[in-house]
Amino acid sequence: MAVIAGLGTYLPKPRQSAADIAGASGLPEAVVRDKLGIHSKPVPGPEDHVSTMAARASRAALADAGLEAQVVDTVVCINEEHKDYPVWTSGIQLAHDIGAKRAYAFDIGQKCGSGVLGLKLAADMLHADPHLDTALVAGGYRNSDLIDYSDPDVRFLYNLGAGAGAAVVRRSGPGHTLLGSSFVTDGSFAGDVLVPVGGSRAPLTPDNVGEYRLQVRDMAGMRERMASRSVPNFLHVLREAVARSGAQVADLRHVAMLHTKRSAHDAILAELGLGPEHSIYLADYGHIGQVDGFLSLQLAAQQGRLRRGDLVVIVAAGIGYVWNAICLRWEGGDAA
C-alpha cells in the first residue's frame, strides 16, 4: 500500500492577529478569538506567491523523506485557483522549481478539500501504474487576499490565511500507510460562495474590479442548509474512511481537522466520542485551505502526540461543497 514518506509545510512570517481582524471588521476582539477561533494567522509577504510557497513546502517534504527531487515521477499539484497567474498550470512550474526533471505535473482542485483528494489520487495512481513509484502532492494557498473584512457575510472566512503543504507519496517502503477515504459533494451549494467577476459569466472590467473578492450570494439560505448538512457530512466521511480502513472510530488517535469555528470543531469530536487530546485546534494558524491537514499532522508529531501504529484521519471541506477524509497508519518518528 502507498505510504507518505515525507511531510513538509511552509508558513509565511507576516501574521495577522485577532486584534488586527477586529479592527478591520468592527467585531469585538473576544468574538474573533472565542467564536471564530482565531488568535492569529500567517498572511503572505511580498514574495509568498502560491507556487513559491508550494516549492518551499515540497523541498521540506523531500528532505523529510531523505529523497532528491529527481526521483519524483509525478507532481500532483494542489495549488489554490487564486495563484500567481490565472489560466496557468502551476504544477509544471512547481516541478521545474524543485528540480523534478523526470516528473510530469498537473493541477487538481477541490478547494480546501484538495489535500485529501491529492493524497487519494496519488495513492490510486501508484497502485494502478507500475511505472510510477514516487508522487509529490503539494500546493500553496493565500485566499486571505480575497477577503473584505467590511463584509459581514464572509465572516466565516475571516480565518483564511496563507501557507503551503506537501507530502511525498511512495508505492511502498518506510512511511505512514494511506488507508481508506471518503468523499461527499453537494452541488446545491455550488453558487453560494465565489468570486462573482473575472470569469466568462462576468468578465473583469474597470467598473467591476472592486467586486473581485469572495462573496456569499445567499447567506441566510446557505446558513440554513449548512446547519442541517455540514456536521452530518463531516461525521459521515470520517466514519466511512475509518470503516474502509478496517478500523473503528474508537481506534482513532488523532483527527487532523481543518480550522473551523470552535463550536463545530468540538461538536464533531464529541459526536465521535473523542476529546480535545485527539485533535489540535489551529487557533494560532487559522484556515490555510488544503494545507490544514498537513500542518495538523506535523504539529501532532512535533508535540509527541503520535506513536507508531496510531490511526490518524485527515478531514477537510471545501466550498462548492465537498467534505472528505482519508486515514493513515502512523509509522514512527516525528515529522520534520
What are these regions (language model features)?
Residues 68-74, 102-104, 133-134, 248-253, ...:
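Short acidic capping loops at alpha-helix termini that bridge into adjacent secondary structure
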